[in-house]
Amino acid sequence: MPLLWLRGFLLASCWIIVRSSPTPGSEGHSAAPDCPSCALAALPKDVPNSQPEMVEAVKKHILNMLHLKKRPDVTQPVPKAALLNAIRKLHVGKVGENGYVEIEDDIGRRAEMNELMEQTSEIITFAESGTARKTLHFEISKEGSDLSVVERAEVWLFLKVPKANRTRTKVTIRLFQQQKHPQGSLDTGEEAEEVGLKGERSELLLSEKVVDARKSTWHVFPVSSSIQRLLDQGKSSLDVRIACEQCQESGASLVLLGKKKKKEEEGEGKKKGGGEGGAGADEEKEQSHRPFLMLQARQSEDHPHRRRRRGLECDGKVNICCKKQFFVSFKDIGWNDWIIAPSGYHANYCEGECPSHIAGTSGSSLSFHSTVINHYRMRGHSPFANLKSCCVPTKLRPMSMLYYDDGQNIIKKDIQNMIVEECGCS
């Protein structure tokens, strides 16, 4: 999340702290002036007026995020039956058997998808010529050594069709995986089919496709299951034999040019009497159509490098930086007449101490900044010598709201960075 937004959130948090904290003269609860947000740890939980003032601060925050100066005046609410019917028709929420509305959290799902996409790597591996004719060898990059969950894997092949010969309109292309395997121990899976055994060597049908043989173009063959099996077995190479029995009849040919094959064909081109300039241009064009494997993969949920340090939950047993749960029910504060959904707001906040040894340990955008500042602060370098590390939000999630405006219109608004999910030391 942008650092600028976090600073703005910090200011809002400080306002809540000031409103909820006792006066500076109160004994035993003085706020630290050089770290205002740290004063949340000293918030007097037993003072009767502290809870209402926190709620008032939350109210103002919600109105501000909805760009409202005051709560809408709902003098003539829409009949319940009409409201529920409209919600069903517009697919903006689900209506439970008890009549309560449950808003569809599309923005939350999108945030989860975006987070997943950020953790996904895409690797393109160009083919090398295999040991046998019409075979290709793919060596998956070391970049993917920590990736164990395949999202998508495809082999791309270029079919070249001469303009003069277009007798056949369709051809079938098959991809076979070649591997050494003890007999009787093959795991064929859904995508592969065992088609032949020669001693300890086996061939599995990876993919098959009927393609148009009237024009030169790329064709894509899915091999996700096969690559997943390779990764599960701790392997990183794939040997593929390409078969196209009807290609010769149609005059079409698959470009299977790899580094080894290029060297082998250099001599053949000269023997055929082709000019070096023309042969070089043809080879360069062929290389632009070199087969490749496209892999999208991510680390598994239980991978040790993927486990990010999670923020602590305040449970009364810890005094270091943690997330404090604070739920405000819209029914309890009299706002359920204009807010249709959700039923309340998780106004979580951060509190606790930030000792020097944990500053900058959170997996947030603040971590690098915090670690550098802490490095200089511990060594007494100006201007960081007198700074204290503060407990601040490091991860926030969006919130969707369904509510009435002053004109009795139903509004659905997605509000970014509304709910504190994790806290860390800045």
UniProtKB/Swiss-Prot annotation:
Residues 21-310 form a propeptide. GO terms for biological process: activin receptor signaling pathway; androgen metabolic process; androst-4-ene-3,17-dione biosynthetic process; autophagy; cardiac fibroblast cell development; cell differentiation; cell surface receptor signaling pathway; cell-cell signaling. It is found in: Secreted. Keywords: Cleavage on pair of basic residues, Disulfide bond, Glycoprotein, Growth factor, Hormone, Secreted, Signal. InterPro entries: Cystine-knot_cytokine, Inhibin_betaA, TGF-b_C, TGF-b_propeptide, TGF-beta-rel, TGFb_CS. Coiled coil: none annotated. Disulfide bonds join C314-C322, C321-C391, C350-C423, C354-C425. Residues 1-20 form the signal peptide. Glycans are attached at N165. It comes from the Eukaryota. One of its GO terms (molecular function) is cytokine activity. The keyword Lipid biosynthesis does not apply. It holds the Pfam family TGFb_propeptide. SUPFAM superfamilies: Cystine-knot cytokines (SSF57501). Residues 263-274 have a biased composition (Basic and acidic residues). Dimeric, linked by one or more disulfide bonds. Inhibin A is a dimer of alpha/INHA and beta-A/INHBA. Activin A is a homodimer of beta-A/INHBA. Activin AB is a dimer of beta-A/INHBA and beta-B/INHBB. Interacts with FST and FSTL3; these interactions prevent activin A interaction to its type II receptor. Activin A interacts with ACVR2A. Activin A interacts with BMPR2. Inhibin A interacts with ACVR1; this interaction creates a non-signaling complex (NSC) that inhibits ACVR1-mediated BMP signaling. Inhibin A interacts with ACVR2A. Inhibins/activins are involved in regulating a number of diverse functions such as hypothalamic and pituitary hormone secretion, gonadal hormone secretion, germ cell development and maturation, erythroid differentiation, insulin secretion, nerve cell survival, embryonic axial development or bone growth, depending on their subunit composition. This is Inhibin beta A chain. It comes from Homo sapiens. The lineage of its organism: Eukaryota, Metazoa, Chordata, Craniata, Vertebrata.
